[in-house]
Amino acid sequence: MNKNLSYFLDKCTYFVGCEPKEVKIRNMKNWGNCRKDKRITLNLKLAKKPPICTEYVLIHELCHLIEFNHGPRFKALMDNFCPNWREIKKLLNEEEN
């Protein structure tokens, strides 16, 4: 995942137009986390998911750098930067067989 993370991070930060202070990867309960100090953490288990899921989580967390909550403005940002985010979210949360 580290190999692909650099690619996805460059792509997504360019697309969204903001950059985190730091990105870490570790085991965690959520797929991603964004702190107010602009540090993003991604779940190591994303490596087992399709690459589009990593891109979605990165865009989701980068949007939190603009809008910290999940209100209408956040959803509008997601709709703009990742129009199919709802479908990707379903794919991400499917149980592995």
Predicted feature locations:
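Active-site-proximal or metal-binding-adjacent scaffold patches in catalytic folds
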Residues: M1-Y56, L65-N97
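Walker B catalytic acidic pair
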Residues: E61
